[in-house]
Amino acid sequence: MQQRGAAGSRGCALFPLLGVLFFQGVYIVFSLEIRADAHVRGYVGEKIKLKCTFKSTSDVTDKLTIDWTYRPPSSSHTVSIFHYQSFQYPTTAGTFRDRISWVGNVYKGDASISISNPTIKDNGTFSCAVKNPPDVHHNIPMTELTVTERGFGTMLSSVALLSILVFVPSAVVVALLLVRMGRKAAGLKKRSRSGYKKSSIEVSDDTDQEEEEACMARLCVRCAECLDSDYEETY
């Protein structure tokens, strides 16, 4: 009976130890952490960057590998589009041929790639997998890519912003110019009624003021011409 009790006590004592080892094992298994953007939006013909970063408890060696895969919408089939091990190996077949570029740096924990000349057909889910032995088990983040055309609304917003930057200052200048001209006209009428005659100094000041007003008017015209040219280039 005493032997059974001793064996039972030893067995019970093993449970806390196994628990510690188990939790330590879980910590080691997930010591490689990978992060990527959940959603990325791009436009047709404009280069898109798919960002992926990782943190590993082990030093980076030539055994580190990076794999990017692509899954089309409404499909369970995935295809490899990029592989890295000491050197980058973008896919040489399929729709992504000659369009995948390496823009990462493994020594900085960056496993990002870019897609050139994207099209609407590139919409889908991209996955980034990193293995850095002995860290080989990790989460697999997924990025949902949405590629669209730059529509009229996007161009219109750019034109609206340009209009605000050009027209608002011009409107302020014109308003100030009109106020000054109105005050000057009112003063001239008042002086003409009272038979007042200007001195040579006042005549000189009026000439300088007229030149300043003419300069401001030319500035407004230049701003309007600049806006017209930018608007034509946009469309």
UniProtKB/Swiss-Prot annotation:
InterPro entries: Ig-like_dom (IPR007110), Ig-like_dom_sf (IPR036179), Ig-like_fold (IPR013783), Ig_sub (IPR003599), Ig_V-set (IPR013106), Myelin_P0-rel (IPR000920). It is a single-pass type I membrane protein. Glycans are attached at residue 123. Residues 32-148 form the Ig-like V-type domain. Pfam families: V-set. The chain crosses the membrane at residues 159-179. Residues 1-31 form the signal peptide. One of its GO terms (cellular component) is plasma membrane. One of its GO terms (biological process) is cell adhesion. Keywords: Cell adhesion, Disulfide bond, Glycoprotein, Immunoglobulin domain, Membrane, Signal, Transmembrane, Transmembrane helix. It is found in: Membrane. Coiled coil: none annotated. The keyword Glycoprotein applies. Residues 32-158 are extracellular. Disulfide bonds join 52-128. Residues 180-235 are cytoplasmic. Belongs to the myelin P0 protein family. Mediates homophilic cell-cell adhesion. This is Myelin protein zero-like protein 3. It comes from Homo sapiens (Human). The gene is MPZL3.
